């Protein structure tokens, strides 16, 4: 599977190694963009940056979820909450860092629990052995599909 497919496609499965490499790389770039956005504009632009990075993060988590036998709707629900939280910041309805809105607080607690559960499940538990409805098991450390190492 190419890196383009890992970052932007929703078909297939990826193993834990590819999941961690892709997720950490995307989040590192996102963090750098957040720093630049915060220096320029603040929370609103930072939230727009988060929205832009939601797509590749969702694609990565969806494919890793496929390897675990998880339907796309589970990481999709997580990202739906993420998008709502970011949108609250973009429209100015999230309050401030000192006084967050009640809606933001109500959404943030389940989001944090969901995030922790997804990271544990996707990042540390092995995938389903053999093929499943999303394709063959990713070959850990061996060439897979297009000859690139998984």
What are these regions (language model features)?
Residues 72-78:
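Pore- or pathway-lining transmembrane helices of multi-pass membrane proteins that form conduits
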Residues 1-29, 57-72, 120-150:
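Membrane-interface extramembranous regions at the lipid-water interface
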Residues 29-56, 78-115, 150:
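Membrane-helix interface segments in multi-pass membrane proteins
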């Amino acid at each position: 599977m190419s890196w383009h497919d890992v970052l932007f496609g929703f078909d297939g499965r990826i193993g834990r190694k590819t999941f961690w490499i892709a997720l950490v790389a995307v989040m590192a770039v996102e963090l750098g963009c957040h720093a630049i956005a915060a220096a320029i504009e603040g929370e609103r632009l930072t939230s727009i940056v988060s929205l832009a990075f939601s797509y590749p993060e969702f694609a990565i988590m969806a494919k890793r979820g496929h390897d675990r036998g998880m339907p796309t709707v589970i990481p999709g629900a997580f990202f739906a909450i993420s998008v709502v939280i970011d949108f609250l910041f973009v429209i100015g309805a999230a309050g401030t860092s000192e006084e967050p809105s009640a809606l933001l607080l109500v959404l943030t607690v389940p989001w944090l629990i969901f995030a922790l559960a997804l990271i544990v499940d996707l990042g540390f538990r092995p995938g389903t052995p053999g093929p499943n409805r999303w394709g063959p098991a990713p070959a850990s450390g061996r060439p897979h599909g297009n000859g690139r190492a998984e």
